[in-house]
Amino acid sequence: MTLNKVKGDIFSQIGYSIAFAVDATYKCDVGICKQLDDKFRVEALLKSLPEDATRWKGKGYCVAFTSGTQDLYALVVKSLPQKYPDYSNIKEALMSLAADVSRKNSILTPKIAMPKICCGSYDKRDWDKIESLIFDAFRGIDCEILIVEKD
């Protein structure tokens, strides 16, 4: 796995799937989730998936889906919008994403763009810890992770 960081717009990263953190209600009304919902109707798409694929079971998980031609990964890291994600749920969601990426990388090296998940003004997690979880989850997997920070 290679991890790179850039400043810019996550939507201008051509050829990248987009991963983002969300709660289990799939409410997309703030931050990057709101932007994704405005562009790709993320909330409605997630809520339309079969219940087994999207049910909160007390630990983090990843939901892979597509909107038009854009592949998306919702990292479900907490039960409700007003809760703070704990690192174990973030780790579980990243491990679920890594497992999905590992299954799909038979032809092309997967490329995933994501913001600094769970580190915004609301969730307030420590980026150094999150970055370490990303490295742990993707160790040995052939993929590229691009962390996109706003300008």
What residue ranges belong to the model's regions?
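Macrodomain-like recognition of ADP-ribose-binding/processing modules
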Residues: 1-151
